[in-house]
Protein backbone atom coordinates (compact mmCIF):
# COMPACT_ATOMS: atom_id res chain seq x y z
CA UNK A 1 0.00 0.00 0.00
CA UNK A 2 1.40 3.39 -0.99
CA UNK A 3 2.09 5.38 2.15
CA UNK A 4 0.53 8.53 0.63
CA UNK A 5 -2.86 6.83 0.75
CA UNK A 6 -2.43 5.84 4.37
CA UNK A 7 -4.10 7.60 7.28
CA UNK A 8 -3.20 7.55 10.96
CA UNK A 9 -4.56 9.10 14.15
CA UNK A 10 -3.84 9.07 17.88
CA UNK A 11 -6.95 8.75 20.03
CA UNK A 12 -6.80 9.05 23.82
CA UNK A 13 -9.57 7.41 25.80
CA UNK A 14 -10.25 9.21 29.07
CA UNK A 15 -12.94 8.88 31.70
CA UNK A 16 -13.69 8.09 35.29
CA UNK A 17 -12.68 4.83 36.90
CA UNK A 18 -14.50 1.71 35.73
CA UNK A 19 -16.06 3.42 32.70
CA UNK A 20 -14.97 0.48 30.54
CA UNK A 21 -11.87 1.89 28.85
CA UNK A 22 -9.86 -1.33 28.87
CA UNK A 23 -12.85 -3.38 27.71
CA UNK A 24 -13.34 -0.97 24.81
CA UNK A 25 -9.66 -1.14 23.87
CA UNK A 26 -9.67 -4.94 23.88
CA UNK A 27 -12.85 -5.17 21.81
CA UNK A 28 -11.56 -2.69 19.23
CA UNK A 29 -8.21 -4.39 18.82
CA UNK A 30 -9.61 -7.92 19.03
CA UNK A 31 -7.09 -9.17 21.58
CA UNK A 32 -6.52 -8.67 25.28
CA UNK A 33 -3.99 -5.86 25.67
CA UNK A 34 -5.23 -4.28 28.91
CA UNK A 35 -6.35 -5.69 32.25
CA UNK A 36 -10.14 -5.88 32.55
CA UNK A 37 -11.76 -6.37 35.96
CA UNK A 38 -14.93 -5.24 37.75
CA UNK A 39 -12.80 -3.16 40.09
CA UNK A 40 -11.78 0.45 39.53
CA UNK A 41 -8.24 1.71 38.95
CA UNK A 42 -6.91 -1.35 37.12
CA UNK A 43 -5.22 0.52 34.27
CA UNK A 44 -2.07 2.04 35.72
CA UNK A 45 0.08 3.35 32.89
CA UNK A 46 -0.52 4.62 29.38
CA UNK A 47 -0.73 1.88 26.81
CA UNK A 48 -1.00 2.26 23.05
CA UNK A 49 -3.25 -0.25 21.29
CA UNK A 50 -3.33 -0.39 17.50
CA UNK A 51 -6.21 -1.08 15.13
CA UNK A 52 -5.47 -1.33 11.41
CA UNK A 53 -8.57 -0.89 9.26
CA UNK A 54 -7.75 -1.09 5.54
CA UNK A 55 -5.60 2.01 4.87
CA UNK A 56 -6.15 3.58 8.31
CA UNK A 57 -4.20 2.99 11.50
CA UNK A 58 -6.04 4.01 14.65
CA UNK A 59 -3.87 4.23 17.75
CA UNK A 60 -5.79 4.16 21.02
CA UNK A 61 -4.19 5.34 24.23
CA UNK A 62 -5.60 3.46 27.20
CA UNK A 63 -5.39 5.77 30.20
CA UNK A 64 -5.94 5.25 33.92
CA UNK A 65 -9.23 6.38 35.39
CA UNK A 66 -9.13 9.88 36.80
CA UNK A 67 -9.35 10.07 40.58
CA UNK A 68 -7.94 12.11 43.48
CA UNK A 69 -4.32 11.01 44.00
CA UNK A 70 -2.84 10.43 47.45
CA UNK A 71 0.18 8.11 47.27
CA UNK A 72 3.10 8.55 44.88
CA UNK A 73 1.69 5.70 42.82
CA UNK A 74 -1.67 7.42 42.44
CA UNK A 75 -0.02 10.74 41.52
CA UNK A 76 2.08 8.88 38.95
CA UNK A 77 -1.07 7.32 37.47
CA UNK A 78 -2.92 10.63 37.15
CA UNK A 79 0.11 12.39 35.66
CA UNK A 80 0.35 9.77 32.95
CA UNK A 81 -3.35 10.00 32.23
CA UNK A 82 -3.09 13.69 31.36
CA UNK A 83 0.18 13.20 29.47
CA UNK A 84 -1.89 11.13 27.03
CA UNK A 85 -3.52 14.30 25.70
CA UNK A 86 -0.26 15.59 24.23
CA UNK A 87 0.20 15.21 20.49
CA UNK A 88 -3.08 13.48 19.67
CA UNK A 89 -5.86 14.10 17.16
CA UNK A 90 -8.90 13.08 19.21
CA UNK A 91 -9.86 12.64 22.83
CA UNK A 92 -12.66 10.18 23.52
CA UNK A 93 -14.51 10.78 26.77
CA UNK A 94 -15.90 7.38 27.69
CA UNK A 95 -18.89 7.71 29.99
CA UNK A 96 -20.55 5.05 32.13
CA UNK A 97 -24.20 5.91 31.44
CA UNK A 98 -25.13 5.07 35.04
CA UNK A 99 -22.39 7.30 36.45
CA UNK A 100 -22.70 10.50 34.42
CA UNK A 101 -23.00 12.64 37.56
CA UNK A 102 -19.61 11.48 38.83
CA UNK A 103 -17.86 14.35 40.61
CA UNK A 104 -14.69 13.96 38.54
CA UNK A 105 -16.33 14.41 35.13
CA UNK A 106 -16.33 18.21 35.26
CA UNK A 107 -12.59 18.15 36.07
CA UNK A 108 -11.96 15.90 33.08
CA UNK A 109 -13.97 18.16 30.78
CA UNK A 110 -12.09 21.21 32.07
CA UNK A 111 -8.81 19.59 31.05
CA UNK A 112 -10.26 18.61 27.67
CA UNK A 113 -11.28 22.24 27.06
CA UNK A 114 -7.77 23.41 27.95
CA UNK A 115 -6.29 20.99 25.43
CA UNK A 116 -8.35 22.31 22.47
CA UNK A 117 -8.42 18.78 21.04
CA UNK A 118 -11.37 17.39 19.12
CA UNK A 119 -13.57 15.78 21.79
CA UNK A 120 -15.87 12.84 21.13
CA UNK A 121 -18.44 11.63 23.67
CA UNK A 122 -18.91 7.86 23.86
CA UNK A 123 -21.67 6.71 26.21
CA UNK A 124 -20.99 3.15 27.38
CA UNK A 125 -23.10 0.39 28.95
CA UNK A 126 -26.29 1.45 27.17
CA UNK A 127 -27.57 -2.13 27.43
CA UNK A 128 -28.00 -1.66 31.20
CA UNK A 129 -30.48 1.26 31.19
CA UNK A 130 -33.58 2.42 29.25
CA UNK A 131 -33.17 4.78 26.29
CA UNK A 132 -34.56 7.68 28.31
CA UNK A 133 -31.65 7.36 30.74
CA UNK A 134 -29.16 7.44 27.86
CA UNK A 135 -30.78 10.61 26.49
CA UNK A 136 -30.68 12.22 29.94
CA UNK A 137 -26.97 11.46 30.32
CA UNK A 138 -26.17 12.91 26.88
CA UNK A 139 -28.18 16.06 27.60
CA UNK A 140 -26.28 16.57 30.83
CA UNK A 141 -22.90 16.08 29.14
CA UNK A 142 -23.72 18.63 26.43
CA UNK A 143 -24.58 21.14 29.15
CA UNK A 144 -20.92 20.84 30.16
CA UNK A 145 -19.24 20.76 26.74
CA UNK A 146 -20.05 20.82 23.01
CA UNK A 147 -18.68 17.53 21.74
CA UNK A 148 -18.00 17.14 18.03
CA UNK A 149 -19.80 13.79 17.92
CA UNK A 150 -21.62 11.37 20.22
CA UNK A 151 -21.78 7.58 20.08
CA UNK A 152 -23.76 5.19 22.26
CA UNK A 153 -22.20 1.78 22.79
CA UNK A 154 -21.88 -1.33 24.87
CA UNK A 155 -18.18 -2.18 24.78
CA UNK A 156 -18.77 -5.48 26.54
CA UNK A 157 -21.31 -6.67 23.95
CA UNK A 158 -19.76 -5.01 20.87
CA UNK A 159 -22.74 -2.72 20.28
CA UNK A 160 -22.09 0.46 18.30
CA UNK A 161 -18.32 0.00 18.01
CA UNK A 162 -18.24 -0.25 14.21
CA UNK A 163 -19.85 3.20 13.87
CA UNK A 164 -17.23 4.66 16.18
CA UNK A 165 -14.40 3.05 14.21
CA UNK A 166 -15.84 4.21 10.88
CA UNK A 167 -16.02 7.79 12.13
CA UNK A 168 -12.47 7.77 13.48
CA UNK A 169 -11.21 6.36 10.18
CA UNK A 170 -13.09 9.06 8.29
CA UNK A 171 -11.58 11.95 10.26
CA UNK A 172 -8.04 10.54 10.53
CA UNK A 173 -5.48 12.71 8.71
CA UNK A 174 -3.28 11.44 5.90
CA UNK A 175 0.08 10.21 7.11
CA UNK A 176 2.35 7.19 7.54
CA UNK A 177 1.55 4.46 10.02
CA UNK A 178 3.44 4.64 13.30
CA UNK A 179 3.39 0.90 14.06
CA UNK A 180 4.07 -2.21 11.95
CA UNK A 181 0.99 -3.87 10.48
CA UNK A 182 1.17 -6.91 12.79
CA UNK A 183 1.64 -4.99 16.06
CA UNK A 184 -1.39 -4.45 18.32
CA UNK A 185 0.23 -2.81 21.34
CA UNK A 186 3.35 -0.96 22.42
CA UNK A 187 3.34 -2.57 25.86
CA UNK A 188 6.64 -4.37 26.52
CA UNK A 189 6.22 -8.13 26.69
CA UNK A 190 7.08 -8.35 30.40
CA UNK A 191 4.58 -5.64 31.27
CA UNK A 192 1.91 -7.22 29.09
CA UNK A 193 2.37 -10.60 30.77
CA UNK A 194 2.18 -9.02 34.22
CA UNK A 195 -1.10 -7.35 33.24
CA UNK A 196 -2.63 -10.75 32.45
CA UNK A 197 -1.74 -12.11 35.89
CA UNK A 198 -2.90 -8.93 37.60
CA UNK A 199 -6.27 -9.26 35.89
CA UNK A 200 -6.65 -12.84 37.16
CA UNK A 201 -5.83 -11.72 40.70
CA UNK A 202 -8.54 -9.08 40.69
CA UNK A 203 -11.12 -11.35 39.10
CA UNK A 204 -10.53 -14.19 41.55
CA UNK A 205 -10.23 -12.02 44.66
CA UNK A 206 -12.82 -9.41 43.81
CA UNK A 207 -13.89 -8.67 47.39
CA UNK A 208 -10.84 -9.54 49.47
CA UNK A 209 -8.02 -8.01 47.48
CA UNK A 210 -7.05 -4.36 47.85
CA UNK A 211 -5.37 -2.32 45.14
CA UNK A 212 -2.10 -2.31 47.01
CA UNK A 213 -0.42 -4.93 44.87
CA UNK A 214 1.78 -5.04 41.82
CA UNK A 215 2.83 -7.83 39.49
CA UNK A 216 6.30 -7.77 37.97
CA UNK A 217 7.62 -10.18 35.35
CA UNK A 218 11.17 -10.67 36.60
CA UNK A 219 12.48 -13.26 34.17
CA UNK A 220 11.72 -14.84 30.79
CA UNK A 221 13.63 -17.86 29.56
CA UNK A 222 13.07 -19.63 26.26
CA UNK A 223 13.62 -23.39 26.45
CA UNK A 224 15.04 -25.58 23.68
CA UNK A 225 11.59 -26.96 22.88
CA UNK A 226 10.34 -23.42 22.16
CA UNK A 227 8.34 -23.09 25.38
CA UNK A 228 8.71 -20.08 27.64
CA UNK A 229 9.54 -20.01 31.35
CA UNK A 230 7.94 -16.99 33.05
CA UNK A 231 8.80 -15.91 36.59
CA UNK A 232 6.61 -13.26 38.17
CA UNK A 233 6.56 -11.62 41.59
CA UNK A 234 3.35 -10.37 43.19
CA UNK A 235 4.16 -7.53 45.60
CA UNK A 236 1.73 -6.83 48.45
CA UNK A 237 1.88 -4.51 51.45
CA UNK A 238 0.81 -6.89 54.25
CA UNK A 239 1.31 -10.50 55.32
CA UNK A 240 -2.47 -10.88 55.43
CA UNK A 241 -2.65 -9.99 51.72
CA UNK A 242 -0.04 -12.62 50.96
CA UNK A 243 -2.11 -15.21 52.84
CA UNK A 244 -5.20 -14.30 50.81
CA UNK A 245 -3.37 -14.69 47.51
CA UNK A 246 -1.82 -18.02 48.48
CA UNK A 247 -5.15 -19.39 49.69
CA UNK A 248 -5.80 -22.51 51.73
CA UNK A 249 -3.08 -25.07 50.99
CA UNK A 250 -1.94 -22.87 48.10
CA UNK A 251 -5.13 -23.45 46.12
CA UNK A 252 -5.72 -19.80 45.20
CA UNK A 253 -2.23 -19.15 43.83
CA UNK A 254 -2.51 -22.38 41.83
CA UNK A 255 -5.82 -21.18 40.36
CA UNK A 256 -4.36 -17.77 39.46
CA UNK A 257 -1.32 -19.41 37.88
CA UNK A 258 -3.40 -21.83 35.83
CA UNK A 259 -5.73 -19.11 34.50
CA UNK A 260 -2.91 -16.71 33.68
CA UNK A 261 -0.83 -19.44 32.05
CA UNK A 262 -3.81 -20.48 29.91
CA UNK A 263 -4.40 -16.92 28.68
CA UNK A 264 -0.73 -16.32 27.96
CA UNK A 265 -0.44 -19.58 26.04
CA UNK A 266 -3.44 -18.70 23.86
CA UNK A 267 -2.35 -15.13 23.18
CA UNK A 268 1.32 -15.88 22.53
CA UNK A 269 0.70 -19.28 20.92
CA UNK A 270 3.43 -20.79 23.10
CA UNK A 271 3.65 -23.38 25.84
CA UNK A 272 4.08 -21.41 29.06
CA UNK A 273 5.71 -22.49 32.34
CA UNK A 274 4.54 -19.87 34.85
CA UNK A 275 6.04 -19.50 38.32
CA UNK A 276 4.43 -17.03 40.73
CA UNK A 277 6.02 -15.72 43.92
CA UNK A 278 4.32 -13.50 46.51
CA UNK A 279 6.47 -10.99 48.41
CA UNK A 280 5.55 -8.49 51.10
CA UNK A 281 6.89 -4.98 50.54
CA UNK A 282 5.35 -2.41 52.87
CA UNK A 283 4.57 0.94 51.24
CA UNK A 284 5.79 -0.21 47.82
CA UNK A 285 3.48 2.42 46.29
CA UNK A 286 5.93 5.09 47.49
CA UNK A 287 8.97 3.33 45.98
CA UNK A 288 8.01 3.13 42.32
CA UNK A 289 11.57 3.04 41.00
CA UNK A 290 12.80 0.18 43.17
CA UNK A 291 10.77 -2.95 42.66
CA UNK A 292 7.52 -2.58 40.81
CA UNK A 293 8.47 -1.60 37.31
CA UNK A 294 6.84 1.81 37.10
CA UNK A 295 9.20 4.04 35.17
CA UNK A 296 8.77 7.34 33.37
UniProtKB/Swiss-Prot annotation:
The keyword Lipid biosynthesis does not apply. One of its GO terms (cellular component) is plasma membrane. Residues 62-65 are annotated as: G3. GTP binds at residues 15-22, 62-66, 124-127. Residues 15-22 are annotated as: G1. Residues 124-127 are annotated as: G4. It is a peripheral membrane protein. One of its GO terms (molecular function) is ribosomal small subunit binding. Keywords: Cell inner membrane, Cell membrane, Cytoplasm, GTP-binding, Membrane, Nucleotide-binding, Ribosome biogenesis, RNA-binding, rRNA-binding. Residues 205-282 form the KH type-2 domain. It is found in: Cytoplasm; Cell inner membrane. Residues 7-174 form the Era-type G domain. Residues 153-155 are annotated as: G5. Gene3D superfamilies: 3.30.300.20, P-loop containing nucleotide triphosphate hydrolases (3.40.50.300). InterPro entries: G_ERA_dom (IPR030388), GTP-bd (IPR006073), GTPase_Era-like (IPR005662), KH_dom-like_a/b (IPR015946), KH_dom_type_2 (IPR004044), P-loop_NTPase (IPR027417), Small_GTP-bd (IPR005225). GO terms for biological process: ribosomal small subunit assembly. Residues 41-45 are annotated as: G2. Monomer. An essential GTPase that binds both GDP and GTP, with rapid nucleotide exchange. Plays a role in 16S rRNA processing and 30S ribosomal subunit biogenesis and possibly also in cell cycle regulation and energy metabolism. Belongs to the TRAFAC class TrmE-Era-EngA-EngB-Septin-like GTPase superfamily. Era GTPase family. NCBIfam families: era (TIGR00436), PRK00089.1 (NF000908), small_GTP (TIGR00231). PANTHER family: GTPASE ERA (PTHR42698), GTPASE ERA, MITOCHONDRIAL (PTHR42698:SF1). This is GTPase Era. The gene is era.
Amino acid sequence: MDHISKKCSMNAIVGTTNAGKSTLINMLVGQKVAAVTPKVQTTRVRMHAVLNNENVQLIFIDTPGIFSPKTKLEKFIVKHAWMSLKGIENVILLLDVKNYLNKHIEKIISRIKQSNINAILVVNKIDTVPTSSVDKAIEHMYSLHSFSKTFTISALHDIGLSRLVDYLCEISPNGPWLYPEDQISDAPLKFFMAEITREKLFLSLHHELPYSLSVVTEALEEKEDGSLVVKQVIYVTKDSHRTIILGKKGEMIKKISMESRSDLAKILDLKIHLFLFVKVREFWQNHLDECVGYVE
